[in-house]
Curated annotation (Swiss-Prot):
Name of this chain's protein: Pyridoxine 5'-phosphate synthase
Catalytic activity of the protein: 3-amino-2-oxopropyl phosphate + 1-deoxy-D-xylulose 5-phosphate = pyridoxine 5'-phosphate + phosphate + 2 H2O + H(+)
Active-site positions on this chain: H64, E91, H217
Residues the record lists as binding 1-deoxy-D-xylulose 5-phosphate: D30, H31, R66, H71, T121
Record's keyword annotation contains Transferase: yes
Main location: cytoplasm
Protein's pathway: Cofactor biosynthesis; pyridoxine 5'-phosphate biosynthesis; pyridoxine 5'-phosphate from D-erythrose 4-phosphate: step 5/5
Ligand binding (3-amino-2-oxopropyl phosphate): N28, R39, G218, G239, H240
Pfam families in alphabetical order: PdxJ
Gene Ontology cellular component list: cytosol
Length: 264
């Protein structure tokens, strides 16, 4: 738990101004499922956690249905689709199986991400430029089913251009390198990575003013504010750090704390 977490007011009413500000906060509850799967039992429930996050002011819920089903399971996706009161953002790889699931569930958002079975977490952005034809067709099929599509990409011009060519409704900029620099205490690299993200937002809006620009990966109370202050960022998706704080303060308070950290 960070120093920030120890001094914040702890009620929704005290923080109503922060709750309603942009960028929006999407909460990833994958690691509630990670804890459940560690014992192969039926608890804790990602759905119950998601509903508490919504109650505390989360603007959306993100879940990643991986091909290896290491945390979120198919049943979680269907449960949430029927009970969330905000927007479901379903992260998934661009496979035939996942397309079929998404078209049945019809989440508000699908965010296409790269996957490697050996990785602990998503290690980088999707190479949209390198598989343009495949992804353009895939995006079109999702949109034909009434689903908005986001592409998780590195903050690079070629990937932004490719995402626009694909017809994506949004991009999510990978903030992992920025976050890792901060954890390593590398202030110079952190500044460089922050500027890359700022430039990417400007580039995206210049190419397509209607394109929504989200960001996420590795964001914590200590590093989120600089990203949240970037003009043009629509939503931040945060999971691991928020769920970690929830172990100490409860999940509703963790959501409130993250909103305050974003807008302090």
């Amino acid at each position: 738990m960070t120093a920030t977490a120890q001094i914040l007011p702890n009620t929704l009413e005290q923080n109503s101004d922060n709750i309603s500000k942009k960028p929006l906060l999407g909460v990833n509850v994958d690691h509630v499922a990670t804890l459940r799967q560690a014992r192969g039992v039926s608890y804790p429930s990602p759905l119950a956690a998601a509903l508490l996050c919504e109650k505390a002011g989360a603007d959306g819920i993100t879940i990643h249905l991986r091909e290896d089903r290491r945390h979120i399971q198919d049943a979680d996706v269907y449960e949430m689709a029927g009970q969330l009161t905000t927007r479901m953002n379903l992260e998934m790889a661009a496979t035939t199986e996942m397309l079929e699931i998404a078209c049945r569930v019809k989440p508000y958002w699908v965010c296409l991400v790269p996957e490697k079975r050996a990785e602990l977490t998503t290690e980088g952005g999707l190479d949209v430029a390198g598989q343009l034809d495949l992804l353009k067709d895939y995006v079109a099929k999702l949109q034909a089913a009434g689903i908005k599509v986001s592409l998780f990409i590195d903050p690079e011009d070629k990937q932004i251009n490719a995402a626009v060519t694909c017809g994506a409704d949004a991009i999510e900029l990978h903030t992992g390198s920025y976050a890792e620099a901060g954890l390593a205490g590398d202030i110079e690299k952190g500044s460089v990575e922050l500027e890359r993200i700022k430039t990417a937002v400007i580039t995206a809006k210049r190419i397509d003013s209607k394109l929504l620009v989200n960001a996420g990966h590795g964001l914590t109370h200590d590093n989120v504010n600089a990203i949240a202050q970037i003009d043009g960022i629509y939503e931040l998706n945060i999971g691991h750090a928020l769920i970690a704080d929830a172990l100490f303060v409860g999940i509703e308070q963790a959501v409130i704390m993250m909103k305050i950290a974003m807008h302090r």
